[in-house]
């Protein structure tokens, strides 16, 4: 909801904690956002979300509202997890919101936004790390447990486990693994990137900025130019202690302009 405003989203549809909104709730959001030119749904790749948003899309079609959907699956850590078939949609979704919101404000058609959205998603890669899992309110305990001296690589925003646990490392070592894994996920290493360091909810901003500094140093050493970077809590997981690293290939120059354009939202 913090990304609703001029230049980004027209509406956000929320379900219960770690639960997809219902098709009826989504349809209400579609109706509220519709201004006659159609509605674009930006959906993170979780099984429940995909099913419910597709049902809502069909319901909107019956009301003669033209609806299209872009699915975000930017997480490179794991292919399948508790809530997904395939890669998860995580913090890179925020950059998709920003770039598509800018182009929608510039008058792009629904079909143009769908095509652009698919290109943005394929150019965006994210990986996360956590020191402590989120506490699910209904359960009253963390989704998984970690010894105090361990971290988990590849965690999801719903507390899904990652791909490896090991002893806590200094920020520079964490940055090294995440940067190298992210860059290696591209078919060809990008020359110019935007970087988002996203806090999961329980990580102090100071630690996020230290990590960003380490990331920027590593990318400079690898000859990768960073022309946009942002730090903060943009896609959180309640009280999870951790962060994620997102990179977007900015070979397409107007994406840079889109990321830098002014918006009137609470959270950007």
State the predicted function of each range.
Residues 72-112, 116-123:
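Short alpha-helices
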Residues 6-36, 183:
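Glycine-rich oxoanion-binding loops at beta->alpha junctions
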Residues 1, 10-12, 38-47, 54-57, ...:
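Short glycine-rich or small-residue beta-strand-to-loop segments that form or flank ligand, phosphate
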Residues 106-210:
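Mixed-charge interfacial surface used for oligomerization/domain docking
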Residues 7, 12-17, 61-86, 222-225:
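Short, acidic/small-residue loops that bind anionic groups at enzyme active sites
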Residues 1-13, 78-80, 151-167:
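Gly-rich Lys/Arg/Thr-decorated short loops/hinges at beta-loop-alpha junctions or inter-strand turns
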């Amino acid at each position: 909801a913090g990304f609703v405003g001029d230049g980004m989203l027209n509406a956000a549809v929320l379900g219960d904690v770690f639960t997809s909104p219902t098709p009826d709730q989504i349809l209400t959001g579609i109706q509220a956002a519709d201004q006659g030119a159609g509605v674009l749904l930006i959906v993170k790749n979780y099984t429940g979300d995909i099913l419910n948003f597709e049902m809502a899309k069909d319901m909107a079609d019956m009301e003669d509202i033209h609806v299209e959907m872009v699915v975000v699956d930017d997480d490179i850590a794991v292919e399948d997890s508790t809530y997904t078939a395939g890669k998860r949609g995580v913090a890179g979704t925020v950059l998709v919101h920003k770039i598509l919101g800018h182009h929608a404000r510039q008058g792009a058609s629904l079909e143009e936004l769908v095509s652009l959205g698919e290109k943005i998603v394929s150019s965006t890669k994210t990986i996360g790390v956590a020191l402590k899992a989120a506490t699910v309110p209904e359960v009253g305990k963390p989704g998984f447990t970690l010894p105090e001296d361990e971290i988990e690589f590849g965690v999801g925003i719903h507390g899904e486990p990652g791909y490896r646990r090991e002893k806590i490392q200094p920020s520079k070592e964490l940055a090294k693994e995440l940067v190298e894994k992210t860059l290696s996920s591209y078919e060809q290493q990008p020359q110019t990137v935007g970087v988002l360091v996203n806090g999961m909810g329980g990580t102090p901003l100071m630690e996020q900025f230290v990590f960003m500094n380490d990331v920027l140093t590593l990318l400079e050493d690898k000859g990768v130019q960073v022309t946009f970077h942002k730090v903060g809590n943009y896609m959180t997981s309640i009280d999870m202690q951790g962060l994620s690293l997102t990179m977007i290939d900015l070979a397409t120059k107007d994406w840079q302009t889109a990321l830098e354009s002014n918006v009137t939202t609470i959270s950007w």
